[in-house]
Design a protein with these regions (language model features):
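Membrane-embedded transmembrane helical bundles of large multi-pass transporters/channels
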Residues: 1-41, 158-374
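Structured non-transmembrane domains adjacent to transmembrane bundles in polytopic membrane proteins
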Residues: 41, 47-209, 215-230, 373-374
Length: 374
């Protein structure tokens, strides 16, 4: 009694579902390419978590304005090769981003035997097996310029100490994280799609429904994360991981709910009536769950000053909105158009044949006739 009839909405879905499905097919490839574009800038570390609208972000911006960007790297090389260490230090100093170097050959002298150096000084730059070069660089903690600088330093160190030099530092860690993620991201995405397909295959007992659902679900995710390419937004990779997982799970639930209800209704109804009945029955549960998530996401975005949380809220709100539109409008279009294929590729579907009478319609007509007779 508290829920308005959804017959009008169901009829609206029936009118627009096929064009909506065509739109999904039209944007699936561009959305996939855009969401995985190398032109999207990801933040992997913590240096951009607090923006200029926070006190901490303003203080950090002021420090950078006065002193510039600064980071510290450490190069570890095998101990005892003083001449090679000197050559390495000289070549690193030639890099414009390297502000200073602290090492044995720089603090003391390559001509002074280590046995004659002061122990306190020696302990700062020499270990039992390795010598340490501490580099102060004028580079941010992460970003394209940092990634290029780390690559240059690694190439120089490997030239002097092939396979033996080691490099550490915040910018180095961020670069390693970026390189690892870049290689693994495609594999992880593929595994996620295969896993979702397998779950849907077991849940629907159909060969065609999992393909349809994965297409609609993944396209909605790709559309969500294609936006930064066109808006220039820098994307926190952690936000991408969290929101894409949530959006995937949410859309799978909605898709299974609608697909299963449609299959049940098709046993006793023709596809038009079954689709109308499905949308009347499933719209409220889907909208209730989805609206809670999208409102929560936008509230987190509006309230939080933490960069990652703020972006998680934004992508969650937008992503759930896209998933709702895709599941409520495009998915019914695929179910309607591919009804015959679904019936043939689904285990024990028992869809009502085209030439069969609709039991629901017959019952309604019989009731109306009885009422008239009385």
């Amino acid at each position: 009694p508290f829920v308005a009839p959804l017959g009008k909405f169901a009829r609206l879905v029936l009118k627009v579902c096929i064009p909506a499905a065509v739109v999904i097919l039209a944007v699936v490839y561009p959305a996939r390419v855009a969401s995985t574009s190398s032109d999207i800038t990801y933040y992997y570390g913590t240096s951009h978590i607090f923006g200029s609208d926070t006190r901490l972000g303003q203080d950090m911006d002021k420090v950078k304005e006065v002193f510039g960007n600064s980071d510290t790297y450490v190069v570890l090389v095998p101990r005892g090769e003083v001449s090679e260490e000197q050559a390495l230090s000289n070549e690193l100093k030639a890099l414009p981003e390297v502000k200073s170097i602290q090492s044995y050959v720089d603090v003391a002298s390559p001509y002074i035997p280590t046995g004659m150096a002061e122990k306190d000084t020696l302990d700062l730059v020499e270990g039992e097996h390795y010598s340490r070069l501490v580099l102060t660089v004028t580079a941010p903690y992460e970003g394209p310029s940092t990634f290029k600088l780390v690559k240059k330093i690694r190439c120089i160190a490997d030239k002097h100490y092939p396979g033996k030099a080691m490099l550490a530092g915040e910018g180095v860690s961020t670069t390693d994280l970026k390189d690892t993620i870049t290689v693994d991201k495609g594999k992880v995405d593929l595994i996620a799609v295969v896993a979702v397909f397998a779950v849907l295959l077991l849940a629907t007992k159909s060969l065609s429904l999992p393909i349809i659902l994965v297409l609609v679900i993944e396209t909605s995710i790709w559309i969500n994360f294609a936006a930064p390419l066109y808006t220039g937004m820098h994307e926190f990779f952690l936000a991408y991981l969290i929101v894409s997982s949530i959006q995937l799970g949410v859309a799978v639930d909605y898709g299974i709910l609608i697909a299963d209800r449609y299959r049940e209704d098709r046993v006793t109804m023709h596809k038009r009536e079954a689709l109308l009945e499905t949308m009347e029955a499933c719209t409220i549960p889907v909208l209730t769950s989805g609206s809670v998530l999208l409102i929560s996401g936008f509230l987190i975005h509006a309230i939080s000053s933490h960069g990652v949380l703020k972006q998680i809220g934004w992508f969650l709100g937008v992503g759930v909105s896209i998933s709702l539109v895709a599941v409520l409008f495009a998915l019914p279009g695929f179910l309607y158009v591919l009804d015959g294929l679904i019936g043939k590729t689904t285990l024990k579907a028992h869809f009502l044949p085209k030439d069969a009478q609709d039991p629901v319609s017959d019952t309604t007509e019989a009731s109306a006739a009885d009422g008239s007779a009385q």
